[in-house]
Amino acid sequence: SIQEQNRQRFLKYQEQLRSELAARYFHSVMSTGGESFSNTKSLNFDGTDAYLEGATNYTLADGASKMTISCWVKFGLMSSTAYLASVRPSGGNRTFEIRTQGSGGSSSTFSLLFYVNNASNQNRFNKSIAGIRNDGLWHHLMICVDLSESTGDEVQFFIDKVAQNPAGRIQNTTFPSNPSPLLIGHGLGNDYFKGAVDEFAIWVGEDLRTQSKVDEIYGTGEATDLANLSTVSAPTTWFRMGDKATIVGDDITIPDQIGTYNLTSEAMIAADVQEDTPG
């Protein structure tokens, strides 16, 4: 009968709808590794001699004009210069570099700097972030770069999704090749980062400073599955830091969640993988 045919069509429609909703839900909670996304660990840096280093030179940014770096950071009490991340041969110029500069124990003088190529003031951006040094809180940092932008607009910093409008300029129009491994927590000399870092990601070839994209990466104020965002593509390189780490004794390996550029620890202990996360 017509009534029975309509009933069968309705039942079939319900089944299709349930299947589609189930598929959407499954996709929304799955990460690239096929597991539901969770963030329970970060990595502690003691500020004395602990850092991470890649086994080979990090060349993915060479020749690119755009890049975005995103990470969650808890800034410790650092004085003088400390490096959050760098690709820089010993004694040479850098492909890029993120560092902080402070003065003594005063929290009133603490700046974030981003460098390309040499240490000239013509190749850097800087901004005071004195209010968040050693405040005991997690902060989301984004550094968005487009070296083809007009002078003074090449770099934008975001802290907790708020634009910081750093001052500076960069003369290079592309990231130079200065062969060196990627270091996190160290650069040159006695310059070790003190604090904690989580979810360190690099997008090569993309400037994600559009506010909607910044908001999407920031999420709800805690770590987000960067490989499955709605409008932002997966990073080029992504280190979960504590989560997904392999620990053998006091040797820690931090795997790249996207590619194959893994990091290994220097002067760290197993307890530096800690249950302290944003949010």
Regions found by a protein language model. Give the residues of each.
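Extracytoplasmic low-complexity segments
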Residues: S1-D49, V214-G279
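Short surface loop/edge beta-strand patches of beta-sandwich-type extracellular domains
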Residues: N44-M67, R124-I132, H186-G189, G219-S230
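Extracellular glycan-recognition modules
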Residues: T48-L113, S148-E154, D191, E206-K213
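Short tryptophan-centered beta-strand motifs in secreted/extracellular beta-sheet-rich domains
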Residues: C71, G136-L147, F157, A201
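Short edge-strand/loop segments of extracellular domains
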Residues: S86-T95, E154-Q164, T220-D225
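Short, aromatic/His-centered strand-loop micro-motif at the edge of beta-sheets
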Residues: F114-H140
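Short, solvent-exposed beta-strand-to-loop segments that form ligand-recognition rims
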Residues: I159-P181, D225-L226
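Extracellular glycan-interaction patches encoded by glycine-rich segments
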Residues: S177-D198, D207, T220-L226
